[in-house]
Amino acid sequence: MIPQKILDKLYSTRTHSFKIVVAGESSVPSRIINDAILTLSYLTKNQKIVVIPGKLVVTLDEFFTVILTVSVNLNIFLPDDLPALKPFIRKLKKFNIALDNIFDKANEDIRKMLLSLAFSHNDIGKTLYWLKHQLNPTPGLERGIVNLISINSYKIESSSIVVDDNHRPVIRLGYALPNYGIDWVAIKPSVLKVDNSFADIPLDVYIQTHALQRLSERIDCFPTGSIHYNMFISLKDPRVFYDGNQNILIEYRYFGTRAGYFRVDIIEGKIVIRTFLFVTNNGTPEGIKLGNITGLQRLDKKYLALDRLSTFMTSDLGENENVRNILNSADCHCLLELYERCQKVATNTSKHFDADLMLKYIGYDKKYLPESIQHAPLLRTQPEII
């Protein structure tokens, strides 16, 4: 049995639960603070982590309070005048050594929580927020520790560049990462297949406000923060293509699955995103192929709402075999993957879409379509740039 004086010492030096504060001079609306408090409390009290396989499973809140208290204060179990505790101490030491990898996983779980918390509030066109987790001494308690979560903010400022003899508003592109801050995007022109003496010098990336609006209109079924985060990730690891007019296209991926392309130019020493093309738009390889197969042109796609992701989050479209065959044949299988992976978490779906109406609109009839379209396999190839 642990002596009372040691239990008292543990209590005074315990690790406290998570506390959320606004950092420094950051400006954070109360609704965001309250949302962070409620959401983080719920997540940390419900997400589990395995400490000892088959024996000990705790919540993240318990891990960062009870388990951390024991780990940090292990030395207080080692007084010379308590030899009876030696077997217990040996077990604790082994337990503490085994905690290293578990701490890494617990910290990664918290980082992911802090990232997702900002998805509902981050907007590259307005303000970016990030949360930082620190273990700080508790005031007034000897070696007491508090799990402090500070909310930081950065208000976005726009500038302008001259495009086609007109001044266009642009925003420097970056994203706020938990425990870090703003990570700005820069790309070497050589990555865009540009060949000159300066091609290996990274250039800052900017996005026209027009392009940001197109992204929101066309990827219209997820929180803005998650849409912008995936833009950031796509540009940090750019996959570059050229269209038939030699325009540079950078693939946009939503959590790893293609959903469209950014058309970019190099202007005034900056890489500038001019617009965003949804994967079915006519300016994309898939959009051109879809038009060739179905005869659908830009206004047809707009009429049928095929120019936005929310349409493809409806079960009427995602589960229609004929539509799936057409999408597969046009290399638009990525939309089926997005449906399968993300439909349940979509915040907006097209409630009025009628897949049969679309098939009638394009005159779909298996008797008149090539065999390859009638029984198209699920393709996994990169788009062919034409």
Locate the predicted segments by residue.
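Ribonuclease/tRNase effector modules and their secretory precursors
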Residues: 1-386
